[in-house]
Amino acid sequence: MGIKVGVLGAKGRVGQTIVAAVNESDDLELVAEIGVDDDLSLLVDNGAEVVVDFTTPNAVMGNLEFCINNGISAVVGTTGFDDARLEQVRDWLEGKDNVGVLIAPNFAISAVLTMVFSKQAARFFESAEVIELHHPNKLDAPSGTAIHTAQGIAAARKEAGMDAQPDATEQALEGSRGASVDGIPVHAVRMSGMVAHEQVIFGTQGQTLTIKQDSYDRNSFAPGVLVGVRNIAQHPGLVVGLEHYLGL
């Protein structure tokens, strides 16, 4: 049989999509579907080698600690990771040479490419802003994808020695200019009928560039998740961002 996979958050919408994708893959074997009321020991009992975690920010750290301590690698799509949480994961992984953790703000290949293209474009434009649009049930704002996109843009601008973005705003309603992520404005929209969408707008004298990405259903995440599951054994330790598995 193939790689033995457990899915955490298996009863959720994304979790159900991942369960179906694993079941349809000849090289993967689904050995555990873990819901909120299930014991994580089922992963060990059923010999899971890799878990996929689409749970909640409140649950994910406990899940990761358990998996790492039991030698199970993890592909994580759950949001809510800040620098402190990432450092904690690195600490747990110390000395665990055969365990990998992939944390990705987005597993849709189109979203990964949007982040990569945005970082490439950043040094050519005076201004950049990020708009993310999601369904109204999303718990966090702005999205991890938008934050990661803005951080990449800011890092590229810093590397290029660029000045702060021009903005003469003196009076504004609170929040009207969005959240500042490393100096890049990020705007969050929550609206019925949407799933997961992002626009990155760049501007300089006489021209603009808009990079736009849309995920119309949760099936868009499955191919990227399976890339992670199939390749995590070659990437021990913590990796943040699916682009590192795609050679981008």
Curated annotation (Swiss-Prot):
Active site (record annotation): H134 (proton donor/acceptor), K138 (proton donor)
Positions annotated to bind NAD(+): G9, A10, K11, G12, R13, V14, G77, T78, T79, A104, P105, N106, F107
Function of the molecule: Catalyzes the conversion of 4-hydroxy-tetrahydrodipicolinate (HTPA) to tetrahydrodipicolinate.
The protein's name: 4-hydroxy-tetrahydrodipicolinate reductase
UniProt-listed Enzyme Commission number(s): 1.17.1.8
Keywords (A to Z) from UniProt: Amino-acid biosynthesis, Cytoplasm, Diaminopimelate biosynthesis, Lysine biosynthesis, NAD, NADP, Oxidoreductase
InterPro entries from the UniProt entry: DapB_C (IPR022663), DapB_N (IPR000846), DapB_N_CS (IPR022664), DHDPR_bac (IPR023940), NAD(P)-bd_dom_sf (IPR036291)
Location relative to the cell: Cytoplasm
Reactions listed under catalytic activity: (S)-2,3,4,5-tetrahydrodipicolinate + NAD(+) + H2O = (2S,4S)-4-hydroxy-2,3,4,5-tetrahydrodipicolinate + NADH + H(+); (S)-2,3,4,5-tetrahydrodipicolinate + NADP(+) + H2O = (2S,4S)-4-hydroxy-2,3,4,5-tetrahydrodipicolinate + NADPH + H(+)
Entry-linked CDD domains: DHDPR_N
Keyword Oxidoreductase assigned: yes
Sequence positions that bind (S)-2,3,4,5-tetrahydrodipicolinate: H135, G144, T145
Pathway where this protein functions: Amino-acid biosynthesis; L-lysine biosynthesis via DAP pathway; (S)-tetrahydrodipicolinate from L-aspartate: step 4/4
Domain of life: Bacteria
